[in-house]
């Protein structure tokens, strides 16, 4: 039985001259607001015109592939929602596989995230007449290694008198995101209990009016401690929302208010994260029970 593993992620431009096309994809071909374009140019210029995210995801793919090379029955692919190779470009390569395991690289179960990746994936599968059993893994926080992975990362920055700010991406339609909130709260609670972190809370970044809150810009003000340690628990790899929005913008603000800032490392292509993905793939293959994909039929989800 041959299985295709599809790692799904947002994608990012490879150089400054790619930014206009990248933003056009995000806005679905509609005009990009001038302020948004200027902000993105400013961000990418700070990092030499390149986010590290595509390189990290390729390394994740390569390292995960090595875990399955000996068996020879699993091939790992990457596809981006807003860059190349796109989901539509990669799906034709999935012909001939008995199973597909699709994993958006996002920590928590989310209706918004699920829809944003599953819809173009299902459309591409139908367009290419691929009718294969598929497991769509909506969130990875319900797997055993998720919490130990974050504990390991936090221990690298653990300092006694600190406020631990667990940071998650805000999402629209909060009425549909009860499970997202549950897994965020549950994971934060388990980590703080196991580690004995006395001062912590969670907040959201990147939101708009009516999205999930509270904002991290409101939460840090609760801290009695003057050292803030950010734990971006809903993210899995370095990209500009981490390197710019947190490490530059947020840091600048809290330092102006007299706080110091540190951030725990991201999972990226670490051995423990690759092991977590390996276990997800192996588990999905073992109990794969999705309906045939095609002609609008539903998929299976691996979710407790």
From Swiss-Prot:
Catalyses: heme b + 2 H(+) = protoporphyrin IX + Fe(2+)
Give me any GO biological process, just one: heme biosynthetic process
Could you tell me which pathway this protein works in? Answer: Porphyrin-containing compound metabolism; protoheme biosynthesis; protoheme from protoporphyrin-IX: step 1/1
Any Pfam family matching the protein: Ferrochelatase
Question: Known CDD domains for this protein?
Answer: Ferrochelatase_C, Ferrochelatase_N
Q: Which InterPro entries match?
A: Ferrochelatase, Ferrochelatase_C, Ferrochelatase_N
Q: Name one GO molecular function term.
A: ferrochelatase activity
Q: Which GO terms describe its cellular component?
A: cytoplasm
Q: Which residues bind Fe cation?
A: 169, 241
Q: Subcellular localization, per the record?
A: Cytoplasm
Query: Where mainly found?
Result: cytoplasm
What does the record give as EC number? 4.98.1.1
| Sorted UniProt keywords | Cytoplasm, Heme biosynthesis, Iron, Lyase, Metal-binding, Porphyrin biosynthesis
Q: Supply the PANTHER family for this chain.
A: FERROCHELATASE, FERROCHELATASE, MITOCHONDRIAL
Q: Which family does the record assign?
A: Belongs to the ferrochelatase family.
Q: What does this protein do?
A: Catalyzes the ferrous insertion into protoporphyrin IX.
Tell me what this protein is called: Ferrochelatase
